Every structure is written in structure tokens, then in C-alpha cells.
């Protein structure tokens, strides 16, 4: 497994804990709003900063897609 995939799984698990939902629900939401590949491809940015910044970014991206 490559480092991007490992980090993506870690990010999904931590984001699910943060939102108090299942990782399946997180992935389904990302898929619903066509964000899965975008988030996956943000490895270079997300793995270098505080994970809370990634959470905020994901929240903002989902909210933007909802509106």
C-alpha cells in the first residue's frame, strides 16, 4: 500500500471519529459530493499540517457542495 492510500485511510478514520460517524458514512458522503479523489489527492497538503485543518477543509468542501 502506498503512503497516499495509508494516509487517506487514516484521515477517513480520524475524520469519522471527529464527526462521530462511521467511516462508511464518511466515504459515502465524499462519494455523494464527488470529493473522494480530490481529498485523496490532497495528501501533500494534508499530511504536512494539523489534522484539524484537514477536518475543517473537508467540512467546508462538503458544505460548499451542499449549497
Give the label of every model feature segment.
Residues 44-67:
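Long, compositionally biased
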Residues 22-30, 34-42:
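Amphipathic, hydrophobic secondary-structure cores in small proteins
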Residues 1-7, 40-51:
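Charged, low-complexity, helix/coiled-coil-prone segments
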Residues 4, 18, 37, 64-66:
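Mixed-charge, low-complexity intrinsically disordered regions
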Residues 6, 24, 33, 49-56:
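Generic alpha-helical secondary structure signal
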Residues 1-25:
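N-terminal acidic leader/helix
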Residues 14-15, 30, 64:
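Low-complexity, intrinsically disordered/propeptide-like segments
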